[in-house]
Amino acid sequence: MTEPAPPSRRRLGWKAALVCAVLGGITLYFSLPTPERDIRQAIIVALRAELTPAMIDRALDDGDVDGAELLADAADLAGIGLPKPTADRLRAANSLWKQALGKTADCAKGAVMGTASGLAGIVCSVAADMTLLGDVRDATTELTKPLRGEEPDSLILGLAAAGIALEVAAPATGGSSMAAKGGTAVLKVAVKSRMIARRLADEIGGILSSAVHLGPVKAMSASDLADMPRASRTLGNAVDMKRLAPLAEAGTSLGRIYKKADGATALMVTRTARSLDDVKTAEKLAAIFGKRTGGVLKALGAKAFDLVVLALRLVWALLGLLIGALCWLVSALVALRGMIRLIRRLLRRSASLEQPA
């Protein structure tokens, strides 16, 4: 009867199997497409299929110069050339003096009033809303509406309270909550300027209705509102931070988009996103396309979010295939080694039986 293989030889066999598995895994890994490359390719293919110069002409016909600029930027990204008449119209609409006058007025309105009718205004408005003053101003505006026979907007009031609570929480969170505050500032300006998708606004409203207790807030008197420290304290204490977490998470993504790209891109996200999940997906788009993300969303709409999700699912599916292939490879190598050892034993036993006694 043959002796079993020594431990050193068995260890050598396992090492050989592991080396083969690692080499196979490396080969499969580098053959996998990266999410960024897949997302970029999918977006560009979709732009080439759906974006036409006529869309830019229609935007100019409607007086939407900002939208026409975004579409032209997306066309440039996809390598779509513009006919000379369209390019000339866009150039004329973007003449320096027209844009300077319009954007300066919109910026002033956004900074002072907190509302905006254009992309320049929202940038200035968000900058103003990044302070306690902006949130207290908006809360005061809403809380004094009943004196004018108007109904307060609970969405704006809730976002103002959330912004204050996130700023108050900044020291305890090491400043990380300020990114979420940036996102809530963008959302608040988008709501005031009617630049937010209805489904997204409804989801945000649902979260705020459970996270913000408006009873104590609505009970504030005029003197309370005039005292900024007291008003800030009352508004901040009205927020349940745990229930606000889903909005804060998406707000963080929106705040990062604002920093990585610009206010125009963040605005396009609020106008296009169907849910807070779409807002978080938009952060991946912004990481790849930067300031051109706004043009992608203007041209493709919510389809851009679906393309990102599809590309990520494909990568995860291929990763699962990789893990399965590695497991199969290791199992096959171990089984092959066992078969070889068995054959060797049988051959040795056969040879020993054939030897004369």
Predicted feature locations:
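N-terminal Lys/Arg-rich, disordered targeting/topogenic segments
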Residues: 1-9
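Compositionally biased, low-complexity segments of secreted and virulence-associated proteins
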Residues: 10-13, 101-147, 161-162, 168, ...
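Hydrophobic membrane-insertion alpha-helices, especially the h-region
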Residues: 13-31
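Alpha-helical transmembrane signal-anchor/signal-peptide segments
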Residues: 32-53, 183-186
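Conserved small-residue packing positions in alpha-helical repeats and bundles
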Residues: 55-59
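Solenoid-repeat scaffolds in large eukaryotic assemblies
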Residues: 67-72
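Short, charge-rich amphipathic alpha-helical segments embedded
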Residues: 74-93
